[in-house]
Regions:
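Conserved active-site and SAM-binding loop architecture
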Residues: 1-217
C-alpha cells in the first residue's frame, strides 16, 4: 500500500500531524516557531515547494486569524477586507503565497487534497478565497468544550462535516462564551492552546483523505 504523505502549515501543536501519523501517514510540519517536531521553521512567505522533500498527497493550512477575526478586523482592515495595517498586508501576502504553492502541487499531483482552516470571520470575504468551496464546522460537534465555529475550505468531495451547532443551543454541552468572557476559546491562554484542533475532527479529515486516496488508485 502506498504511503500517504502530507504537509501541515502553521502547525503549532501539530493537531493534524499527530492524527495523520497515528494513521500511518508521513507528515512534514511547518511553523514560524520551533515547536516540537516542526520540520521547517521559518516564514511561509519565504518557502517554495522544493523545501518540502516530497510531492504531497494532501496539505492542511491554518493561517493566522488575527487580522481576519471579527473581534479585531476593524483594527487591521477597512470594510472588513481592505488591509490598513502592515500586519494585515503581510497576512494577505502569506496566504496568497501558500495558495500559489497549492496550485503548484495540484499541477504536479492533480489528486492533491487541500484544507484551509480559519475561525469563522473575515477570511471568507477575501477575494483570493472565493474560488474555494467552504464548509463551516463547530468544534463542539467534535467533542470539544468550545463552540468555535470554524471555516474550512477544501477540494475533497469525500469529506462530509458533521452538522453545525448554534449559539445558545440547549441540547449542546459547549461552554457559553459571550464576547469578552473568560470561557470558550477566549478563555484559552495563548494562541498555541487556542489554535488546537479537536482530535475527532483531525481524524475525520485524515480518514476522508485515506478514503479518497484509495478511491483514486
Amino acid at each position: 500500500m502506498k504511503e500517504i504523505k502530507g504537509v501541515e502549515f502553521f502547525a503549532g501543536s501539530r493537531s493534524i500531524g499527530k492524527a495523520a501519523e497515528s494513521l500511518g501517514m508521513k507528515v512534514f510540519s511547518v511553523d514560524w516557531q520551533p515547536f516540537e517536531n516542526i520540520d521547517y521553521v521559518g516564514d511561509v512567505e519565504n518557502m517554495n515547494i522544493k523545501d518540502v522533500p516530497f510531492i504531497p498527497d494532501w496539505g492542511w493550512f491554518s493561517p493566522d486569524c488575527t487580522t481576519y477575526s471579527i473581534a479585531s478586523c476593524s483594527t487591521h482592515r477597512n470594510n472588513s477586507i481592505e488591509p490598513k495595517s502592515e500586519y494585515a498586508i503581510k497576512c494577505d501576502r502569506v496566504n496568497k503565497h501558500f495558495i500559489a504553492m497549492i496550485d503548484e502541487w495540484l499541477e504536479l499531483n492533480p489528486n492533491f487534497i487541500f484544507y484551509i482552516e480559519n475561525p469563522r470571520g473575515m477570511l471568507r470575504k477575501m477575494p483570493f478565497m472565493q474560488r474555494f468551496k467552504r464548509h463551516t464546522v463547530w468544534y463542539c460537534q467534535y467533542g470539544d468544550d468550545r463552540a468555535k465555529p470554524t471555516d474550512i475550505w477544501t477540494n475533497n468531495k469525500n469529506w462530509i462535516p458533521r452538522p453545525m451547532c448554534k449559539n445558545g443551543n440547549p441540547n449542546c454541552t459547549h461552554e457559553r462564551a459571550p464576547r469578552g468572557s473568560k470561557t470558550g476559546t477566549q478563555g484559552k491562554k495563548g494562541s498555541f492552546d487556542r489554535s488546537k484542533i479537536p482530535n475527532e475532527l483531525c481524524l475525520e479529515v485524515m480518514q476522508s483523505i485515506i478514503k479518497t486516496n484509495q478511491h483514486e488508485r
